[in-house]
């Protein structure tokens, strides 16, 4: 079998957005002889997960990339189901189970290099992940940039802003908990597959483990900007409510 059809079939088998023939041809021809198929799959996967779905720069096959149906996305539309699989990317994620004031206090503590454990204030360990342990007197820039609110437990509910290939944006809410969604787990620019049958109610996508498949990935510039501006955005929302 020709290498390009093999590569395309392998990428589609793991639910990635359909790559363009031009992208695959360039990738295969970049070295002579071509790299082994597993290496090509890994490279193509990384590129596809890091691209902007709404401006894919010829990486994706637009003819095989359906958008969210406009009728279902209307705020006054009643419940509907997606008739086909749709790839989207994450623009925002928020834990609705934690108040915005609590999120602000946690982020301000992280900015000071602190985090609370029970009643004890401790220093954030260098390079610690959001749900990782903390240690005294040792913090790092990654902790300050990425550490966020509370651990996403089994009862947490998250709201996301999703974008399709045409740039349409829509809110999505966990109807049932999805382990791979959460602050510190979900990256900005991450790709997700909304499977056919996904319910959309009043313009909001309802996410369940059966219909939402997180694929991973990240658009670095988007994620950095989101993380750095998150504290101010929370303050703006809270401040706006109190000035009305």
Locations of regions flagged by a protein language model:
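OB-fold/S1-family single-stranded nucleic acid-binding modules
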Residues: 102-108, 199-234
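Short nucleic-acid-contacting surface segments enriched for D/E, G, S/T with interspersed K/R
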Residues: 81, 178-195
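Fungal eukaryote-biased detector of long internal structured cores
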Residues: 166, 180, 186-188, 201, ...
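Structured beta-strand/turn binding interfaces of compact recognition modules in eukaryotic regulators
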Residues: 89-96, 163-165, 173-177, 195-197, ...
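Nucleic-acid-binding small beta-barrel platforms of the OB/S1 family
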Residues: 1-154, 230-244
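Short, contiguous, well-structured surface segments enriched in hydrophobic/aromatic residues
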Residues: 149-169
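A short, polar/proline- and glycine-enriched secondary-structure boundary/capping micro-motif
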Residues: 93, 110-112, 181-185, 217-220
């Amino acid at each position: 079998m020709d290498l390009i059809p093999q590569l395309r079939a392998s990428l589609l088998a793991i639910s990635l957005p359909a790559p363009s023939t031009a992208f695959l041809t360039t990738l295969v021809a970049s070295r002579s002889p071509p790299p082994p198929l597993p290496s090509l799959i890994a490279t193509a996967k990384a590129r596809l997960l890091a691209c902007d779905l709404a401006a894919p720069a010829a990486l994706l096959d637009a003819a095989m990339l359906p958008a969210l149906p406009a009728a279902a996305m209307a705020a006054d539309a009643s419940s509907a189901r997606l008739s086909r699989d749709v790839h989207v990317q994450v623009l925002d994620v928020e834990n609705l189970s934690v108040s915005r004031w609590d999120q602000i206090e946690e982020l301000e503590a992280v900015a000071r290099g602190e985090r609370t454990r029970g009643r004890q204030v401790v220093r954030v360990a260098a390079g610690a992940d959001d749900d990782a342990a903390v240690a005294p007197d040792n913090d790092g820039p990654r902790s300050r940039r990425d550490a966020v609110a509370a651990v996403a437990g089994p009862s947490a509910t998250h709201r996301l802003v999703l974008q399709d290939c045409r740039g349409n944006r829509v809110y999505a809410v966990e109807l049932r908990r999805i382990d791979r969604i959460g602050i510190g787990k979900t990256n900005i620019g991450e790709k997700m597959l909304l499977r056919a049958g996904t319910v959309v109610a009043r313009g909001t996508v309802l996410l369940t483990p059966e219909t939402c498949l997180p694929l991973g990935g990240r658009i670095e510039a988007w994620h950095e900007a989101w993380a750095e501006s998150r504290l101010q955005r929370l303050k703006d929302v809270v401040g706006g409510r109190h000035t009305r």
